[in-house]
C-alpha cells in the first residue's frame, strides 16, 4: 500500500506525468532489449504503431509514376519524402487499396497451378461436412502425422533437384534427375509454368509443398491421414471434438493406404510359398500401385506398418528400430535384458520352449486403438498403465502385455493344447501360440492373474478381471489411465537383416517383425494395385487364376511354343502354372498330367497333328507331377464357381471357348485375348509365305542353337543360318537369302523343301 500511495503522490505532480509521457526512453538496458538482434520483440505493438503513422510502407520509386499522388477522395497516397536509409518512397496504406482497384492487371493463368495445394484445400473444405460437437475427455496421443495433403513422396534432395531444374534451369550446379517420378514431375511442371510471372522464390516454395512429405509430431485423437490433420484445430480440443468428413481425398493418403494393403497381401502370399523371401521380392518388383512401381514407393514412403516394413527390410532399406508383437509397436524406453532359452509347462502340461528376457525393462506399447506403458522384470509384469478408445481395445492391450511378460501364471492359465498354425500350415512359435490362445478367450488368464488393493491416484483407475472399473481393487499391476501414451517420436532408421522366412532382426539379433505380426484385416485399396506376379492371381479367387493363366500363355505364345517343342519339362515347371494346380481336384491331378503329356508327345511325333488351341487349353494340366496310367479323358475338371466345371479335351465348353472366326478366346464368358493360330493348321502351304526371304536347308541342326520363333527371324543377317519353328511344331534349318530378288521363288520351293526336311 505504501508503494501505491507513493506512486499516486508522484503522479499528482504535473512534472512527473510530463516526464513519463513526453521524454525519450534513454535507459541503456531498455534500448538494448528492443534494438539488439533482428527479431522483433513486440510485433503486434510494432504493427499497431506503424499503421498509425501516415506512411508506414516503403515502395520502389517507380510507384510515383504508376500511382497518382491523390485518390478520388483527395487523400494523399505517397509522400515526397524518401525513406531514410534507402532509395524508396514512403507510401500510405491507401495506395495499396488504389493499386488493388486500379493497378495493372496481370495474367492469372498460373495462379491455380502454382498455388495448387491451396486451391485444392479450399475445395476440400467447401465440400467437407462438419457434424455435431461432442464434449468429452479427449485421449490424445502424439503421433507422427503428415501435415501436407496432396504431395508427392520425393526426398528433400530429390525435390531440391527438381525445383532447381524447373525454377532455375540455367543456374550452374550438378543436378541428377534419376527416379521416374523426378523426371515426370519436372517435365509436367516445366510445361505448366511456361512464361510464369510469379516470383521464382514463391514458385520454389510452393513446389516444395507439393513434392515433399512434411511430418509433425502432434497430439491426435482421431483420423491421422493428412486430410484430417489439416483441420485438426477445427476437430479436436482439450474437452471437445467436432465430427468432420473431408470433402475429397488426396493421392498421398491413397498411396499410403494402398501400399499397406498391397504389402499385406504380398507378405501373406509369400509366407505360404516354397521360398518366402524370393517370392516376396519377385512380387514387390512386379507390382504397381496407381501406376507407380511399388519398389519406388517403398523407397520413398515413410509409412511404418508391419507388412510394409517387412517389404522394406527385404529390399535392404532401413526401418524403425521398434518391434512388433500382437499388433502393438513396442519401443524400449529404459533398462536392458539378455535372452535365454527356457522350457516351461502349460496348464495342460505341454512343454514350450520360450526365449526369456532376463532383466528389468520399460516399454511403450502403441496400437491402433490403445496405448500403454509396460514395466517388466524377468518373467514378471511390474506395472501396466493402459488407455484406449473402448473396453475391447483395452482388453487387447492387457492380453498382449500379459503374454509378453512371460509370467508363470499366464502360462499356467492355458487350457487345452496349443497347436495354432500359420497360413503355410507351420506351427507358430510359442509366444504367438500363447497370444492366439488368450486372444480367443482370456477369462482364465484374467481370473488367475490375481488382484490387489490400490491407492487413489489422479487420472488412474483399477480394473477387475471382468473388466469393470474400480477405485479400490485392480488386477495385479494393471491400471487404466485417462491419458494416452505418445507414439515413439524418433524418425531414426536402423539397418536390419531378414531371413528366408521373412523374420526381420536388428543387428543384435532381436526379432523386430515376422509374418505372424501382419494384420489379417482386409480393406479395399483406393488406388488400383496391379500384381503382375502369377503368385497374386489367386487373390481374386479361382476364376481370376483361370483367366490369368490362359492370358499368360497367349501373351507369351511365341516362346511357349518353342519350349513346348524343344524343352517341355522346363515349360511344365514354370511358376506361372502353380496357382492353376489348386483348381484341379487333388486325387486326379497326376493322371490328368500324365494323360496330357502323352498327348503332347504324340503331337510332337505325328506330323500334322499340332493344334494350337488344344495345346493352350491343356498345357496348365501338364504342370502337375505326372502319374503313368492308361486312362484316357474326354474332359478335365476344374473347381471354379464353387463346383467342378468341365474343360473338353476336344471342342469348346463354357470354361474354355475358342471362336475360330473371330480368333477370340473366352474363359468363363470373360474375354481372354486373341489367339494367333499357327499357319498350316488346316491351311497347307501358308508357312512358306512366312518364310519368304529364307532358304530352307533341311532338318534341324543343333549346332545353330535353339529354334527361333518366326518373329525373331527378322534379326538374322543376310547369309546367316538358324533353326526355326514352323507351323506344326516342327523345326527346320533356314538361311537368310543374300539377294532380295529371289524372294518370289521362295514360296513355291519352301513348301516342297519343308515336306522333305520333315520327312
Curated annotation (Swiss-Prot):
One GO CC term on file: host cell mitochondrion
Subcellular locations according to the entry: Virion; Host nucleus; Host mitochondrion
Record keyword Translocase present: no
Site entry: Mammalian adaptation: 627
HAMAP family given in the database record: INV_PB2 (MF_04062)
Function: Plays an essential role in transcription initiation and cap-stealing mechanism, in which cellular capped pre-mRNAs are used to generate primers for viral transcription. Recognizes and binds the 7-methylguanosine-containing cap of the target pre-RNA which is subsequently cleaved after 10-13 nucleotides by the viral protein PA. Plays a role in the initiation of the viral genome replication and modulates the activity of the ribonucleoprotein (RNP) complex.
Quaternary state and interactors: Influenza RNA polymerase is composed of three subunits: PB1, PB2 and PA. Interacts (via N-terminus) with PB1 (via C-terminus). Interacts with nucleoprotein NP (via N-terminus). Interacts (via N-terminus) with host MAVS (via N-terminus); this interaction inhibits host innate immune response.
Descriptive protein name: Polymerase basic protein 2
Native species: Influenza A virus (strain A/Tokyo/3/1967 H2N2)
Gene name for this UniProt entry: PB2
